[in-house]
Amino acid sequence: MWQGNLELIYTQKNLATQISHLYATAPLKVQRPFYPEGKNLCHTVILHTAGGIVGGDVLQQKIHLQAATNALITTASAGKVYQSNGQMAQQLIEIKIDDNAGLEWLPQETIIFNGAAFRQHLRVDLGENSSWLGWEITRFGRSARGEKFLAGEWHSNWEIWRSGQPLWLDRSFLLGGKMIEGFSGLNDSALIGTLVYIGQPVDRNLIEKVRDFSLEGEMGVTSTLGDGLLCRYRGNSSGEVRQWFQQVWQILRREMSDREAIIPRVWLSW
């Protein structure tokens, strides 16, 4: 069992976003930062060196973007949560984004194996004029092998706050078996995705652009409190939801910051 910790602090120095503090214990690790979009947007890749999460693991991450910094954080590969040994695996993430800073939190998908027990909690605290774009893509069962999530449990809690006020609170819970098959659960789908943007005002034209995609899976798009956008997906194709979320990200980049998104090179192996 692992008790992994990661601490990251981003600081602006000479108009560049730099990692000023990094502390990591196994199995968590951070690759050398990249700057494919210029010195004030730091691309950061987090690795899980053990290959997957097991029952009893507790992984904690604390990430702080100081004022006027910008970062994109992703993961080196898909996350895996293995069948439980009877204990709950936990992932706890706290993110603080100071005034005029921005974070794009774009991890690769997480695969929840049949029989896994997993709880994750993500809290984001935003400063004034700061922005957040984050997504979560979760596959239940190794469906490529015909495996379904027939036993186990999954909990996912998201919280996004600004100045002590909640902007987005999302509590999700799924038991293996009937909840996978039922319409109020996954409706016999294998995969769900959530994308949340909080930042500048989102108008109707932008929402229509985001909706203007033809998907085999089910999709939903709406605005949120705090000048935000919410996208939901339920279906079976990792490639489809990744492509849609990437296109939404690119639209938001163009509309909100007048620049094109550059795909992290670690994604090129997808």
Each PLM stretch: what is its role?
Residues M1-E109, N114:
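N-terminal, charged/glycine-rich beta-strand/loop interface patches
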Residues M1-N5, I9-T25, L41, Q90, ...:
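N-terminal intrinsically disordered, cationic/polar leader segments
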Residues K29-R32, Y82-M88, G115-A117, S143-E147, ...:
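A short, polar/proline- and glycine-enriched secondary-structure boundary/capping micro-motif
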Residues I73, W132-W135:
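Short, hydrophobic/aromatic beta-strand segments
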Residues Q108-T110, W135-F140:
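Short, surface-exposed recognition loops or helix-turn segments adjacent to catalytic cores
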Residues T138-W270:
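A structural signal for small-residue-enriched, beta-sheet-centric alpha/beta enzyme cores
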